[in-house]
Amino acid sequence: RAMHFFGDNARVAAQVASLREGRFEDFLNMIKASGDSSFKYLQNVYSVKNLSRQEMAVGLALSDVILKGKGVSRVHGGGFAGTIQAFVPNDIVDIYKKNMEDIFGEDACHVLKIRKYGGMKVL
């Protein structure tokens, strides 16, 4: 757990710098690295109460196949077989969603959009 924790703390600083400097591909690569670290070192893509359930690992592998390096995915949230967060280019969102729902069922994939201005401070 410590390997992931300290590695991810370093990645966060690098992610912030990459976004400030307009290096979005570097940001995505660090998102992928963080997710891979979470998978390997936290082993949080499955529940220890039900090891036969491998949907998260399958979903991450399927994401790699669909995205073919054009986007990234990672385990996200509380872990323990929770959610996949995927950064998918607009031109393949429909393909990604269809493929994921063909495997995991209708409404398994939710498309979110980030507004142009991102987060803002509210006084």
List where the protein language model places each region:
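C-terminal nucleotide
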Residues: 1-74, 85-123
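Short Gly/Ser/Thr- and Asp/Glu-enriched loop/turn motifs at secondary-structure junctions
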Residues: 76-82
